[in-house]
Amino acid sequence: TGNLHVGGARTALFNYLFARSRGGKFVLRVEDTDLERSTKKSEEAVLSDLSWLGLDWDEGPDIGGDFGPYRQSERNALYKEHAQKLMESGAVYRCFCSSEELEKMKVTANQMKIPPVYMGKWATASDAEVQQELEKGTPYTYRFRVPKEGSLKINDLIRGEVSWNLNTLGDFVIMRSNGQPVYNFCVTVDDATMRISHVIRAEEHLPNTLRQALIYKALGFAMPLFAHVSLILAPDKSKLSKRHGATSVGQYKEMGYLPQAMVNYLALLGWGDGTENEFFTIDDLVEKFTINRVNKSGAVFDATKLKWMNGQHLRSLPSDLLIKDFEDRWRSTGILLESESGFAKEAAELLKEGIDLITDADAALCKLLSYPLHDTLSSDEAKSVVEDKLSEVASGLIAAYDSGELGQALAEGHDGWKKWVKSFGKTHKRKVSVIEGDCGLILLPTEGLFLGCFNGLAKPLEHLN
């Protein structure tokens, strides 16, 4: 249901990295037992977001596999088969309690200040009592018999030993009165029949492990190894939610984030390789990922750092890989009608140094192409600069452009450009600096003046002579 939350994406990433690092298989299963809320649109969106992140799966609903089908809604026959096995073994029983009776039990438990466990009679009902209700057509659920004493322990790969007292659980439902299996029963049957060896999931599923462990044992299945990762927190240390801003992978994709940056950042939410390095490709992560380096404590989602990291990844990309993204955006917004002269490549090389998101390129290009040069030159702030032999500086810039010196500086990237600007300023006895993101030129003695940028630099400067 819904969209792929960044928390779900991180969980998928950890499963992917673990499987790839161990030579295992990464399985995608669609858990759509909530028929009222589950939609095909949501499924397609989740699969699309996982693909965008580069998390390719080995088995799944779209590609099949040896243990399909991979949608829970298509596995009902299997669930009913195993529910019947539990019924025949006496591990479950039919419960004919009405919703009103169950509500009274909750009220009583609350008054007695005890866990709201099932206290109905059907766990010990006679065959005759059960048959009587069946003949009357009374709706019933399947309840699992939980031992009333003892405890259950598991060794979580992240949290270590975790235990529960069985008397806090009570008999729980595995099949609803409408014949639909509940989540805990489905995933147990699925993990067992699909031969899942490891389950890495969010810590909010930890309480479910108790029910699932009991079902595994009753069915005679070996239990997979579990690893429960901490929740992703907002800056205020509460659970990350929509009120904190964007939370889905799709939203970040639309905002102009790169998939490799998202993967890099999500991997660092609760994991590290033990060094100070913060930049990893997905291949690096596969090589270095180990479950024992995943932290127990919650990880804070820092949108500012994610944006910074995205900018670092963007600047490391060859411009050729950005051209299509830029051209597609500029054509869709009407900024660019056609490009046959290498304009997009030049623009990508120039702009990527000063932006953090793909979407920032729109405003950056508009700013670059529509800079109000003449208004700036005629302003009071520019007066002292213009009167201080500006035409000589302009002539020097035009000469540098005509000789190819300026083009060579641009070809050397942002660092090369900054070096050339400083050298030019020294030659003309001006204090010079570069505007980050605008690739512009400031000549001071006192106030800053943007003179131009990009390969069209000569045209506006010609008017200064």
Q: What is the predicted role of each segment?
A:
Residues 35, 221-376, 448-465:
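Catalytic adenosine-cofactor/nucleotide-binding cores of aminoacyl-tRNA synthetases and other
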Residues 324, 395, 401, 408-465:
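Charged substrate- and nucleic-acid-binding regions of tRNA-handling and nucleotidyl-transfer enzymes
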